[in-house]
């Protein structure tokens, strides 16, 4: 890991981006969304069809208690291996990626994609760890998540970190620079 970032617990990483994919089928919401609406995920399945998609790389929490959850997990790991072997990804080595997301109200959220040092993370309420949870952690969701990661050749985190930056020295300077970007339809 890059020593310059040690005190942050947040580092540049080898970031995988899909290349030559239909982004309407590739991108899906975080796995912890629509947990009580399996019909939402069935509709996503219909939309994606056989196309490469992050749907094949995540375990929607709506399926955590499915009787065939172990089969889902094996399929996720197989999809990861296949996508890597088939060259589905473009690799951005040792990178941070600046992102902008437009919310439904029109506001733009700005952020960085990178790697979090999980040794610096603690989800215990009241923790003083460098990186800590801002909302409650549902403990019974951890074991299936750990099973997905056990044999996973890639990581697909879905967390958003909030930073304590009252001087606005991290994200705000990036918003002033012009970038080439991909706009999703």
Where are the model-predicted features located?
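N-terminal extension/subdomain marker
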Residues: 1-177
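Conserved small/polar residues in nucleotide/adenosyl-binding loops
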Residues: 180-184
């Amino acid at each position: 890991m890059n020593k310059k970032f040690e005190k942050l617990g947040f580092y540049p990483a080898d970031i995988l981006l899909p290349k030559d994919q239909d982004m309407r089928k590739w991108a899906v919401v975080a796995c912890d969304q629509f947990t009580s609406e399996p019909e939402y995920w069935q509709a996503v399945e219909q939309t994606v069809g056989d196309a490469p998609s992050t749907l094949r790389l995540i375990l929607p929490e709506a399926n955590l208690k499915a009787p065939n959850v172990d089969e889902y997990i094996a399929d996720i790991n197989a999809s990861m291996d296949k996508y890597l072997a088939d060259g589905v990804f473009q690799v951005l080595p040792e990178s941070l990626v600046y992102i902008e997301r437009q919310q439904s109200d029109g506001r733009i959220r700005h952020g960085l994609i990178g790697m979090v040092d999980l040794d610096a993370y603690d989800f215990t309420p009241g923790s003083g760890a460098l990186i800590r949870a801002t909302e409650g952690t549902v403990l019974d969701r951890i074991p299936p998540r750990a099973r997905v990661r056990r044999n996973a050749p890639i990581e697909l985190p879905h967390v958003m970190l909030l930073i304590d930056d009252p001087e606005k020295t991290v994200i705000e300077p990036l918003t002033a620079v012009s970038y080439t970007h991909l706009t999703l339809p």
